[in-house]
């Protein structure tokens, strides 16, 4: 399973660790992902999505039905 938020599309990005001496070593910044079940009132069922913390805030703001409609138009499975 890839580390990608289904709502926002956030994915890992590359960067550097910096020591006290400012030596650079490569690292990955991972999104804050959680598998979360959301109740969809229109369908009378739970839907499990892999979302970031920001994605949960988007769902709280827009509503799960609107977000699922966006996922359907993008052709994503959920």
Swiss-Prot record:
Protein's organism: Pectobacterium atrosepticum (strain SCRI 1043 / ATCC BAA-672) (Erwinia carotovora subsp. atroseptica)
Membrane-crossing segments per the record: none
Gene3D superfamilies: Ribosomal protein L28/L24
GO biological process, one term: translation
Pfam family, one: Ribosomal_L28
SUPFAM superfamilies from the UniProt entry: L28p-like
GO cellular component: cytosolic large ribosomal subunit
Gene assigned in the entry: rpmB
Keywords recorded for this protein, A-Z: Ribonucleoprotein, Ribosomal protein
Species lineage: Bacteria, Pseudomonadati, Pseudomonadota, Gammaproteobacteria, Enterobacterales
Protein's recorded name: Large ribosomal subunit protein bL28
InterPro entries: Ribosomal_bL28, Ribosomal_bL28/bL31-like_sf, Ribosomal_bL28_bact-type, Ribosomal_bL28_sf
Family, as annotated: Belongs to the bacterial ribosomal protein bL28 family.
GO molecular function, one term: structural constituent of ribosome
């Amino acid at each position: 399973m890839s580390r990608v938020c289904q709502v926002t599309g956030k994915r890992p990005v590359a960067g550097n660790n910096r020591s006290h001496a400012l030596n650079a070593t490569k690292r990955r910044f991972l999104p804050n992902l959680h598998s979360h079940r959301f109740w969809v009132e229109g369908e009378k069922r739970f839907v499990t999505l892999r979302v970031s913390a920001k994605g949960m805030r988007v769902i709280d703001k827009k509503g799960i039905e609107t977000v699922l409609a966006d996922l359907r138009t993008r052709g994503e499975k959920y």
